[in-house]
Each structure stands twice: as C-alpha cells, then as structure tokens.
C-alpha cells in the first residue's frame, strides 16, 4: 500500500510539471530569492506566547490589518474551532510574509540586510506535550527557530523538551524572553536558566527597560546597535521612539550605564566563541564600544548557524503589549540561516542513510556491504538521477472545505505551486527550492511521504529502483498509549465514519485506527487524553460524523519471553475463487538489544514496524540478481518481501493472550525459493496469508507454554514544584504510584539533552531584575525556588494526576509526561488488570 501511494503521488506530480526547468528565471535572481528566505518555527512551552507573538509578526508585516487575540478566538494561525475554544495551538500552522514589508524596503547596493525585504515562512507549533509529534514533524523542515520563554515562569519542562529536539536536528535558535510586563517577570533569572537548563551560553543582545517611577515595562535596550527603544503608551506597537546613547544619558542615566555593561559583556562573551571578532576586539585595544554593530551581528551569526546551541542570542519583549516584535523580526533576518546554509537533508533508502545531494549527484552511500537490500543502490547512475525533476517532503496534510486535501511540502529540489496563510491558500507562480508551500489534488499523500517528479515512468511500477523507496528525513512515530472505541450511530454511518477517521489519520499520523476482531469496533489510539479529546471534537463537530467515542483507556501490549522453534506451514486454499499456495517458516524471539543495532548487522530484508523487527530470510540466495532469477515470473524480491511483511504485521496486531498488539518481538520469516514457492499459484495474497498463519501458530504455541507477557506504558514524568512541596511529590510518586524517582534538581532532561558542557552561570551577564526577593545566583539552592522531579511512572497511575499535583503543591505545581518505553506488568498490577 505504501509503495502504491508513492507511485500515485509521483504520477500526479509529473502531471503538475513540478520542475524548475519549466520556468524561466535567471540564476542570479533565483539565488537572491533563496538567500533572502527564512524558514523558521516558533517553539515553546504551552502558554509562553507563541501564537500571540506570531499574530504581531503578521500585523507588522502588513499581512493582517488587525491583531488577532487568543482569548477572543480571532487569531490567524489558531483557526480550528477547537483551538479557538480552548485557547491553545493544536496543529502547526504555516504562514508566509515579508519583513520588512515591501513598501518599507529599499534597494541596497552595499548588501545591508535592513534594506532588503525577506520572505519568512513561519510555522507556529503547539506547546502541549500531547502534540509533541506535531512539533517534531515541523522541526524536520525548519532552517531556524525562535524559542519563546515566559519571563515569569522561565525555562519550563516542555521548553527543555522541544529545545532538545531542535538540538538533535541542529537547528539554529534564538530566544525571545516574553511577558516582561507581567508582575513577577525576572529577565535575569530566565537568562541564567538558559545557561543552566538549556546548556547554551546566553548572548544578551537586548535588556528590558523599565520606567523609573512605576517600574512599568516600557521598552528595550539594544546592546548591539547601542540604542534604546521606547514603545509609547497603549498603542498598536508602531509608535516607537529611538534613543541613541547621548539621548539615553539624558533620559535615563542608570539605564545608559546598564546598556554599556550589556554591550561590553556581549562582545566579551562572543569573543570566547568567535576568533574573528576576538581579533577585531584586540585591534581596538579591547574597546567593546568601538566595534560596529555589523561586525557583532556577523559574529553571532557565525556562532549560531551550525545549530550547535553553544551560543544563544537573547532578546526581550512583551508580545501582548506589542513590545519588542519588530527588533525580533530584524534578528530573524540577520541571524538565522537561509536554506542554502543548512546541512544536506538526510535521505533513507531501505534503511541506509545518505545526503540528498549524494542521490542527486549519483554518488553512493559509503558503507554498502553484502546487505542484499542495499545492493540495489549500486544501480544508481548519473543518467538515472539526472531525470529527477523535483523532490519534496510532505510534513503535514490538512483538509480544506473548498480545496479538498492540502499537502504541505518543503521543496528540496525543483519548483511548484501554492503557499498557505494559515487557513487560506494563495496561488503563486512557482515554489522554489527551500520554500514551504502546498500542493492540492494528491489523493494518497500522507505526512512523511517523499514526493518525486520523474518523467516517462511506468505508472504501475513507478520510478526505477531505488528511487521508488527514497525517504527524506524519516522520523519515528511514537507508539500511541491511549485508545477509545468509536461507535457509529447506525450501520449506514459506518462507511462515512471510517472515511472521516481516515482523514484525521492522514492529517495526524500519531493517531492510529484499528478494528477489534471480536466486537468489530473501531479503536482510535493517540498520544494522550487531550489528543483523543481533540480528535473526538473534530470528528463530531468539524466533520459532522454521526458517532460516539467511548471512554479513553490505556493501550497495553503483549510480548514474548523466549524464542520459538521454527514453525513451518503450507498454505493451500482458494482466495477469491483462485487456487493459492505458498509455504514458509517463522521464528519469533524477544528483542534483547536495540532494534537499530540488529538492523545494521543483518544481511537480510529487515524492517521495523511498531516496535517489532520483521526479517525475511531467503535461503540459498546471495544477491538480488540471483534471487530474481529463481522467483516465478510474476514475482520480484521486493514484492515477495512486502507481501510476507504485510502478513506478519497483520499477525502481530493481535496477541494470543489479551488481544493486545505485540511489541518488542523479532519475527524471522524463512523461505526457500526452490521448495516454498509454487509457480503461478504463489500470489502476493498467498504469501501474506502463509506468513500471517505461521506467526499466529507460533504465538499460540508460545502462549500455551506460558511465554506471553503483558507490557504497560511507562512514562517519563517531569514535575515542577517548589521546595516546600518537593517531599510530598517524591513520596507520592514512590509510595502511592509505583514509580521511581530518577533525579531531583533543575531538571535537565537527559534523554533530550543538550550535548554541551555545563556552564558556570555566575559568569553570565544579566541586568538586575526590576524586583528581586533574593539575590539569585542559581536556580537550586534557594528556598522557594522551582525544583524539578524526573520520575518513571506507569501510565495508569498518571490518569487524573493534574488535580492531584495541584492539591499537593497548593496549585503551583505543573507536570508533563512523555512515553518512555513499555515495561512488563507483574504481580499485583497484572492481577488487577
């Protein structure tokens, strides 16, 4: 099915002429356009102000005529009814705008960035932990990101999570400390937390400016350009008064002195990372004030662009009060990379990885050995890859009432056709390499698909191998841990409900639909209770499906304790009125090491599916050429492999003990081409059936021997509380919930961790906060400071935990949790189940 979908997508793209060769554009103009493109995302913890900041960006760019409000439900990027009613972002939204607006930009002859209007493709992402996968699939296609921090709460748990994910993709990031107008906002404390929790050295480019008498947040001090910006009154943020250093000395002498300290600290901190600026600093006798702003911006960019996260530019503002947005947009233009400055996107071809440029240039992945499946890569040639007209990654699929299915793509090679303004599609003449846009009319495309335009191919078999299995930047979909039954109101509604659920799953692959074989019920699985609640709301209210969702339950798994002996069977019966015959053997064993390690060592056809390894082993065959010669005329090695794999997947979807899906098993299908295949009687359906029956028989035999176990989801829980509540939280986790505490402290998430050395936060420059209860030198040693508990807890014990943690912490505690692994259910917990 997957291959079929890819073929249809490719066929449609070829009809669209998705190719840069179809348009006459000078190379110079094209390079100028791509150099002035920024693909960025807004990432943060929930309620940090992502959507509010995005709305201001759209307003100041001239794309909208009024500022949308989250509380009113009038935002552009939160356009789903569920988003507007709940006031949270559920889906990533794509929007394109120019900054500065075209009417404010002028032609530049010296290349100064401020005179050029840039195209910014912006993705506003969710902050809730249930929608982490939505963030992940957006991160794949970004060239840079703006991380927004709540100036009151500081670095929060989900912030660390998404920061770690961006670190894995090596995405350059800048930080915007938001909500500095709020009571309790502490810019200095938040900056220190960037160093202690995110492990990046904060380069403080802006500092907050407060009124002397009232302490009200009025603007920012720009340490790079040595100026102060004052946003006057309760305006729309366009009335800005700028003060140079001489004027600032008259207006606010104390802030003038602080801004000088900030400039000196900024230059000295950057010199530790950039040798070029260090030499320039030495040339002016260590005078940080005499270095021009262009040199500082260029130096920060050099440190930032590799995505290492070692230096973190920090900016200040208050989005709701319209303060600080325009300088933030300038920083996006000046600091974040264009598409040509990012590393070559990773491509997977049958579990082997290489760069896209290697494919387009006909070069091979260096580590090909005797692996049968990777040997097909040797057929790559310049004549083969030179025909690739376009290549794009589907990172999102959405349904539109007027235009049907919209397929969001990031173009990596070639050009084509629409751009999105959140919920509105705007047709454009073409979509260049490096751009983000939308294609309509792709009936079978799903999130994660790779789109290739290839001329003159056979629509039945698609482009030549191995181009028909190329995958751009593949990511693993985390296993769903909650499920609920979907019950249509009548038999006549079943088809419509199933089709509607299919649309939801195309949009969000972290949802999963299965059918209970005993009851026939449709079971919808997801990443969390909120995730499924949103799916239910969309199913009933948006798509008007006549169905009811049952109670949300936990999704358990089954696994095997010991390896089974080879179970060899022969399938010989009619399928659709035609004789079908095939044979194979099956061995099932538990996975005792990482599946990826096994994948790298095996010399057979091996795939990973839902936490299981599936291997197809052909006896007495050493190469694809030899194998294909032995197969019946209507079969190929890839078709045999996919048919057998589909049969195994079907068998593993339902265990013998409690009908839960199998997990953490390694299934090996053994097939002798000479004795297990029977000419024309061996069809793909026969191969799938014999593999399914062989695995099911082996599982039943294992169950009769008491070797099938139950697994439950184990969650990694991050609880934020104050010192006074810490003891109660730890006791509750350990005693009442059957969990175990992994660590206490400031809570650096080791699994997503930033692979950088710890930073001495006492060396970090921060201005004095507008109010301070104590002199904060770190986040862990003061009574009343926020602490974080990292624990492993069974998912069942975390149901309804939010109310409980509020009770234990007097309403001040928060938590997030993410799936960690499936763990064996034992003793009392197994008996209760």
Model-identified regions with their sequence ranges:
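Accessory interaction regions appended to the cores of large information-processing enzymes
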Residues: 193, 202-208, 213, 334, ...
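P-loop NTPase catalytic nucleotide-binding module
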Residues: 2-7, 26-46, 151-395, 399-400
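Amphipathic alpha-helical transducer elements in NTP-driven molecular machines
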Residues: 34-37, 51, 73-74, 87-92, ...
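Conserved structural-core and active-site-/substrate-pathway-adjacent residues in large, well-folded domains
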Residues: 47, 53, 87, 124, ...
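A conserved hydrophobic secondary-structure block that centers on an alpha-helix together
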Residues: 124-125, 151-158, 512-514
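Short, surface-exposed connector motifs at secondary-structure boundaries
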Residues: 119, 143-147, 170-176, 308-313, ...
């Amino acid at each position: 099915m997957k291959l079929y979908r890819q073929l249809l997508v490719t066929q449609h793209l070829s009809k669209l002429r998705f190719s840069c060769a179809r348009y006459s554009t000078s190379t110079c103009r094209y390079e100028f356009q791509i150099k002035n493109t920024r693909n960025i995302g807004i990432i943060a913890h929930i309620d940090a102000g992502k959507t509010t900041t995005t709305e201001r960006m759209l307003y100041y760019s001239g794309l909208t005529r009024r500022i949308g409000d989250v509380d009113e439900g009038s935002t552009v990027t939160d356009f789903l009814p569920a988003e507007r009613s709940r006031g949270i972002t559920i889906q990533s939204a794509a929007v394109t705008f120019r900054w500065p607006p075209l009417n404010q930009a002028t032609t530049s002859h010296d290349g100064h960035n401020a005179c050029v209007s840039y195209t910014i493709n912006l993705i506003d992402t969710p902050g809730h932990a249930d929608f982490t996968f939505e963030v992940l699939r957006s991160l794949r296609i970004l060239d840079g990101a703006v991380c927004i921090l709540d100036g009151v709460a500081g670095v929060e748990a989900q912030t660390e999570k998404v920061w770690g994910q961006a670190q894995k993709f090596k995405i350059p990031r800048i930080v915007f400390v938001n909500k500095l107008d709020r009571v309790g906002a502490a810019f200095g404390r938040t900056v220190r937390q960037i160093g202690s929790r995110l492990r990046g050295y904060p380069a403080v480019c802006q500092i907050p400016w407060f009124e002397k008498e009232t302490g009200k947040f009025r603007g920012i001090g720009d340490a790079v350009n040595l100026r102060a910006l004052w946003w006057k009154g309760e305006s729309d943020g366009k009335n800005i008064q700028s003060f140079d250093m001489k004027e600032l000395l008259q207006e606010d002498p104390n802030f003038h002195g602080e801004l000088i300290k900030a400039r000196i600290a900024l230059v000295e901190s950057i010199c530790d990372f950039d040798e070029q600026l260090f030499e320039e600093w030495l040339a002016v006798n260590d005078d940080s004030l005499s270095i021009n702003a262009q040199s500082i911006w260029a130096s920060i960019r050099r440190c930032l662009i590799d995505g290492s996260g070692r230096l973190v530019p920090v900016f200040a503002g208050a989005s709701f009060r319209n303060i600080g947005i325009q300088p933030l947009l300038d920083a996006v233009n000046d600091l974040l990379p264009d598409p040509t400055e990012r590393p070559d996107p990773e491509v997977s071809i049958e579990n082997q990885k290489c760069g896209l440029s290697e494919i387009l240039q006909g070069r091979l992945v260096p580590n090909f050995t005797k692996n049968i499946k990777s040997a097909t890569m040797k057929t790559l040639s310049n004549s083969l890859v030179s025909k690739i007209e376009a290549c794009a990654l589907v990172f999102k699929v959405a349904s539109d009432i007027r235009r049907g299915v919209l397929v969001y793509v990031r173009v990596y090679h070639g050009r084509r056709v629409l751009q999105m303004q959140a919920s509105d599609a705007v047709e454009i003449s073409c979509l260049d390499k490096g751009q983000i846009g939308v294609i309509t009319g792709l009936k079978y495309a799903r999130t994660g698909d790779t789109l290739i335009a290839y001329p003159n191919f056979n629509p039945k078999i698609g482009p030549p191998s191995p181009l028909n299995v190329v995958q751009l930047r593949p990511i693993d979909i985390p296993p769903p841990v909650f499920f609920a039954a979907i019950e249509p109101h009548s038999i006549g509604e079943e088809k419509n409900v199933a089709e509607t659920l299919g649309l939801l799953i195309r949009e969000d692959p972290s949802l999963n639909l299965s059918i209970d074989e005993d009851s026939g019920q449709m079971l919808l699985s997801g990443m969390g209770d909120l995730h499924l609640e949103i799916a239910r709301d969309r199913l009933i209210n948006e798509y008007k499906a006549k169905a009811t969702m049952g109670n949300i339950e936990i999704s358990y798994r089954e696994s095997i304790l010991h390896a089974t002996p080879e179970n060899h069977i022969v399938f010989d019966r009619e399928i659709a009125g035609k004789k079908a015959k095939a044979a194979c053997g099956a061995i099932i064993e538990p996975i005792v090491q990482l599946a990826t390690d096994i994948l790298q060592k095996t010399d057979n056809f091996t795939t990973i599916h839902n936490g299981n390894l599936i291997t197809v082993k052909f006896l007495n065959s050493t190469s694809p050429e030899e194998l294909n010669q032995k197969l019946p005329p209507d079969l190929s090695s890839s078709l045999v492999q996919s048919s057998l794999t589909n049969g195994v997947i079907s068998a593993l979807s339902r265990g013998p003990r409690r009908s839960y899906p199998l997990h953490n098993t390694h299934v090996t299908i053994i097939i002798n081409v000479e004795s297990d295949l029977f000419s024309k009687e061996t069809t793909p359906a026969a191969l799938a059936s014999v593999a399914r029956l062989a695995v099911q028989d082996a599982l039943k035999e294992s169950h009769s021997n008491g070797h099938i176990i139950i697994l439950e989801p184990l969650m990694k829980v991050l609880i934020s509380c104050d010192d006074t509540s810490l003891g109660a939280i730890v006791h509750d986790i350990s005693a009442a919930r059957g969990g175990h505490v992994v660590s206490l402290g400031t809570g650096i998430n080791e699994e997503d961790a930033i692979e950088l050395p710890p930073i001495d936060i006492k060396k970090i420059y921060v201005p004095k906060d507008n109010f301070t209860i104590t002199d904060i030198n770190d986040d862990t040693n003061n009574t009343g400071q926020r602490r974080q508990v990292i624990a492993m807890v069974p998912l069942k014990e975390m149901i309804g935990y939010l109310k409980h943690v509020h009770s234990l912490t007097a309403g001040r505690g928060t938590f997030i949790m993410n799936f960690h692994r499936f763990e064996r259910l034992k003793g009392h917990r197994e008996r209760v189940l």
